[in-house]
Amino acid sequence: MKKLISIVLLFSFISFAFAQNATVKGVVKFSGEAPKPRLISMKADRQCDAIHGGKQVQAEDVVVNQNGTLKWVFVYVKEGVKGKYNPPSEPVVLDQQGCWYHPHVFGIMVGQKLEVRNSDPLLHNIHATPKKNKPFNIGQPVKGMKSYHTFDTPEIMVPFKCDVHPWMSAYAGVLDHPFYSVTNDKGEFEIKNLPPGTYTIEAWHERLGTQTQTVTVKAGEVKTIEFTFERKK
């Protein structure tokens, strides 16, 4: 009975603690006329080309959604986080499917496993070129192969490429805390479970640069902010 009461009290404390935390959410907008989608031909590799039926594939470096927002923007807390956070035991998955990296942009914590998969029946190589972390270049010639990696130092951002297929690219935001998000096909992001405090929030886009805002959140508050990027001249 005492054990049951202790468990109930523990869960009550955890629920109370999370209820006291805040959320920062919002959208990332694009100002001006959206650029024409950049199309990629995969004819250099017959197998890749066949997977897509000979059709060109839209690049993901600048994706303006139908509602005028931006996809694939990495939004994270740049300054203000206190304390230490343990990485999740669940790995982040970077898949190679259709001669393409999935997802194009993602976040991962220091010490968290990155699982790189090859879902294609052909050779890929995962070539990470960080500046602060140790680079790696691993070949995966067989469908279903997996490799695992971790990062030791926070870094914004770590680029990935495939030397076999030069159109393949991805980016990882490596942080020592879990407060980050990536915009979706509506341009939305959401950073949950922030302790009350003042934070610098940065939005990173691979072509359009970065923007920052300072926000202060109270216990249990949900704060909405917006970022707006425009085409570089």
Question: Where would I find each of the regions flagged by the language model?
Answer:
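Extracytoplasmic copper-binding redox domains, predominantly the cupredoxin/blue-copper superfamily
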Residues: Q20-K233
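Sec-dependent N-terminal signal peptides
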Residues: L4-I14
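N-terminal, intrinsically disordered, basic low-complexity segments enriched in Arg/Pro/Ser/Thr
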Residues: F16-F18
